[in-house]
């Protein structure tokens, strides 16, 4: 039975997508939500086999997990079906497993931009076997660009549900014009956190290495469970080198992201 918050999981029977399923179930248990597990086949004759495989996946889960899952095997184009499901179901999160940004591109091809860039649904990307039954620390980078703080409400919502602290990390680049934008964004985010009673702290990195190296090392040092970072159509998820670095972080920290332009 579908109830919200709802976690949409595209599933291809790989170990990677199985990890995404486990993570989504943990989120559903903590937040009294449910999981929509979907597999897409290209032609109708493949549907019966996929349905049996999907049934076996669910049968191997605990009764408590099984109660939270609604499953569907759809026929069509995987990119289009994920988009349709997101539009109809309005999930709180799309939870996807990947080897990394290049892994997403390999699995979904260039059409991943159609799935993600045209949706205001936040995406949780996970690598490896991670757990989210407890989230204590969320690291959120931001810059002088207003789009960089569009992830704030989603990160704050997760922090409130888990009682987590958000570590806000400004990207300082010694450009005076940029510093003004960073200061403005910091004030906006701080006000939002205070008004919504979200625990947070400001973090100043040493600026001894490039920002993203220091950001990821910091996230690893504080044992962050989630990195929350936004993107826009101007810096697409699968091609932006900074987002690739965040997704491919050596600590395998799940990444919460959303298309800022679709939120306007």
Role assignments for model-derived ranges:
Residues 1-15, 19, 117-151, 248-264:
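Intrinsically disordered or low-complexity boundary/linker segments at protein termini
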Residues 6, 32-36, 68, 136-137, ...:
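Residues at the starts of beta-strands that form the adenosine-phosphate
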Residues 21, 25-29, 83, 152, ...:
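A structural alpha-helix within SAM-dependent methyltransferase catalytic domains
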Residues 22, 26-60, 168-194:
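Acidic, proline/glycine-rich short linear motifs
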Residues 68-71, 202:
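Rossmann-fold cofactor-recognition segment
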Residues 73-81, 207-212:
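Charged docking surfaces used in two-component/phosphorelay signaling
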Residues 84-131, 220-264:
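Gly/Ser-rich helix-loop-strand patches that form or flank binding pockets
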Residues 149-181:
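An alpha-beta-alpha
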């Amino acid at each position: 039975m579908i109830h919200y918050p709802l976690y949409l999981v595209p599933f291809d029977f790989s170990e990677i997508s199985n990890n995404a399923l486990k993570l989504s179930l943990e989120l559903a248990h903590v937040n009294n939500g449910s999981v929509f597990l979907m597999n897409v086949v290209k032609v109708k004759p493949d549907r019966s086999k996929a349905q049996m495989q999907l049934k076996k996946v669910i049968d191997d889960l605990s009764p408590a997990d099984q109660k939270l899952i609604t499953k569907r095997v759809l026929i069509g184009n995987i990119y289009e079906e994920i988009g349709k499901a997101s539009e109809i179901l309005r999930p709180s999160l799309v939870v996807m497993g990947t080897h990394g940004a290049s892994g997403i591109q390999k699995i979904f091809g260039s059409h991943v931009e159609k799935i993600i860039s045209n949706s205001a649904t936040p995406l949780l990307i996970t690598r490896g076997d991670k757990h989210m039954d407890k989230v204590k620390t969320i690291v959120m980078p931001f810059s002088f660009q207003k789009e960089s703080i569009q992830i704030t409400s989603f990160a704050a919502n997760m922090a409130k549900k888990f009682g987590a602290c958000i570590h806000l990390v400004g990207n300082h680049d010694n450009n005076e014009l940029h510093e003004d934008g960073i200061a403005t964004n910091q004030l906006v985010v701080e006000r939002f956190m205070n008004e919504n009673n979200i625990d947070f702290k400001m973090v100043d990195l040493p600026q001894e290495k490039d920002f993203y190296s220091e950001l990821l090392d910091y996230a690893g040092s504080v044992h962050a469970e989630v990195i929350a970072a936004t993107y826009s159509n101007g810096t697409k998820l699968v091609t932006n080198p900074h987002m690739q670095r965040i997704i491919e972080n050596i600590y395998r920290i799940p990444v919460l992201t959303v298309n800022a332009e679709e939120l306007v």
